[in-house]
Amino acid sequence: MYLRKISAPLMTMLLLNGCAYIPHKPLVDGTTSAQPAPASAPLPNGSIFQTVQPMNYGYQPLFEDRRPRNIGDTLTITLQENVSASKSSSANASRNGTSSFGVTTAPRYLDGLLGNGRADMEITGDNTFGGKGGANANNTFSGTITVTVDQVLANGNLHVVGEKQIAINQGTEFIRFSGVVNPRTISGSNSVTSTQVADARIEYVGNGYINEAQTMGWLQRFFLNVSPY
């Protein structure tokens, strides 16, 4: 009987703790790497040099830049994100109104009620409103990450994806990146800045006790949601 009294509150707390878990939805979903497709079987054409041989996979002419163009090729992304935004608004409204009405003659029996044989009426109204708001946001992200080509689009653009994991003490930091790269923007050092990548998805998250310390507790979130203030 004593164990039942203890187990019931304990199970309730465990259920509430499980419901309090909020899963993180990553911006870069799916696999973060790609393997090159196996080379097709060579067709004899009478030449000594066969470009489709496995040992010559990725062959490029001597005077052509070495740029990624196949699935599995790598590319270095230079992260240079600096976004700043500000917004302010204000509004003022004022309205005044006055109305008067007078009657110089009135029945004699209303003299005692109205006074001096006349009836006067005056209405005055005043309404004033003022509002002001503002918001500022600044975000800076810098670094490098090497990604892999996982798709070659019909127009020649490359869809790239990559992930970097860094373990620090008892926590792990994840940097994920995906986007579409125009091969013409790739420099001679096989790199491109993140500002030249279309549909860029940049994610920097971590796990461990430091990340858990930055998460609000389930009971605190409960009171935050139900509190009217």
UniProtKB/Swiss-Prot annotation:
PANTHER family: FLAGELLAR L-RING PROTEIN. It comes from the Bacteria. Coiled coil: none annotated. The basal body constitutes a major portion of the flagellar organelle and consists of four rings (L,P,S, and M) mounted on a central rod. It is a lipid-anchor. Assembles around the rod to form the L-ring and probably protects the motor/basal body from shearing forces during rotation. GO terms for cellular component: bacterial-type flagellum basal body, distal rod, L ring; cell outer membrane. The keyword Signal applies. InterPro entries: Flag_Lring. Keywords: Bacterial flagellum, Cell outer membrane, Lipoprotein, Membrane, Palmitate, Signal. GO terms for molecular function: cytoskeletal motor activity. This is Flagellar L-ring protein 2. GO terms for biological process: bacterial-type flagellum-dependent cell motility. It is found in: Cell outer membrane; Bacterial flagellum basal body. A lipid is attached at C19 (N-palmitoyl cysteine). A lipid is attached at C19 (S-diacylglycerol cysteine). It comes from Yersinia pestis. Residues 1-18 form the signal peptide. Belongs to the FlgH family. The gene is flgH2.
